[in-house]
C-alpha cells in the first residue's frame, strides 16, 4: 500500500492493542472484517521477538456495565495467540479509554526512557483504539506505521442518533486508512511490507 520501501528501526516498538477474547463474541459486536488479522498479528509478534525489538501489549479494562472486556469477565483475557507469545520483558499497558497513551503505566514515558521513536500499531478495533492511538502518537511526534491487515473491526451504527447512519467494518477500515495517512498521522502499510523490512535488518 506504500509507494516507497519502509524501514523498521532497530528499537521500533510493536503495539498489540486489545487483542482480547471478548472480541470473539460475535453476538455482542456484530459482523467483523479481515479474518486474517490474528494470523498477521502473530507473524509480527514472532518477527519482533526474533529480532529482539520491544513489544507493548495493551489491554482494555472496560468500565461499561455488562462489557465483555470488563476485568471480571473472561473476555478481558488476551487471545491465545498473544498469551502464548507473551514474554516477561513485554510492557503491559492497561487502559479504560481508546488511547493507549492514557493507560497504566505511562506509555509515552516508557518509550522516551528507551529512546523509541517509531511505533508499529496492530490490534482491535481498527477505527477505535488503534486509530485513536495512532492519531495521538502522530501528534506526539512518533513515526507511526499501521499494517492495516493486522487490525480488524466491526460494523457500526449510530444507535439512537437522528441520522440512522451506519458503516460496514470494511468501510470503517478504509476510512481509518484515509484518516491516518491522508491526515498525516501515520503511514498505512501491509504486514508483508513490515515483515520484509524486519527481515532485511535481521539478515543484514
Where are these regions (language model features)?
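Hydrophobic, well-ordered secondary-structure scaffolds
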Residues: 1-26, 38, 58
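Active-site-adjacent betaalpha module
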Residues: 2-13, 43-46, 50, 68-204
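Short beta-strand segments at enzyme active-site cores
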Residues: 17, 53-60, 147
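A short acidic, helix-capping loop that chelates divalent metal ions and anchors anionic groups
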Residues: 23-27, 64-66, 155
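Acidic/histidine-rich helix-loop elements
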Residues: 24-34, 161, 165-167
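A short alpha/beta connector and helix-capping loop motif
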Residues: 28-57
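Short glycine-rich, polar/acidic loop-and-turn segments at beta strand-coil junctions
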Residues: 41, 59-62, 97
Amino acid at each position: 500500500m506504500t509507494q516507497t520501501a519502509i524501514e523498521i528501526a532497530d528499537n521500533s516498538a510493536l503495539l498489540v492493542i486489545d487483542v482480547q477474547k471478548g472480541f470473539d463474541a460475535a453476538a455482542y459486536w456484530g459482523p467483523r472484517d479481515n479474518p486474517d488479522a490474528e494470523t498477521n498479528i502473530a507473524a509480527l509478534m514472532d518477527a519482533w521477538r526474533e529480532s529482539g525489538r520491544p513489544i507493548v501489549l495493551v489491554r482494555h479494562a472496560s468500565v461499561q456495565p455488562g462489557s465483555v472486556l470488563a476485568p471480571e469477565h473472561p473476555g478481558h483475557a488476551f487471545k491465545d495467540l498473544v498469551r502464548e507469545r507473551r514474554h516477561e520483558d513485554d510492557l503491559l499497558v492497561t487502559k479504560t479509554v481508546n488511547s493507549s497513551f492514557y493507560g497504566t503505566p505511562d506509555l509515552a514515558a516508557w518509550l522516551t526512557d528507551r529512546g523509541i521513536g517509531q511505533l508499529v500499531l496492530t490490534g482491535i478495533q481498527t477505527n477505535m483504539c488503534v486509530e485513536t492511538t495512532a492519531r495521538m502518537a502522530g501528534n506526539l511526534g512518533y513515526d507511526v506505521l499501521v499494517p492495516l491487515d493486522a487490525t480488524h473491526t466491526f460494523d457500526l451504527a449510530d444507535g439512537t442518533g437522528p441520522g440512522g447512519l451506519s458503516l460496514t467494518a470494511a468501510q470503517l477500515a478504509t476510512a481509518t486508512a484515509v484518516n491516518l495517512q491522508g491526515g498525516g498521522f501515520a503511514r498505512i502499510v501491509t504486514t508483508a511490507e513490515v515483515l520484509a523490512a524486519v527481515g532485511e535488518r535481521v539478515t543484514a
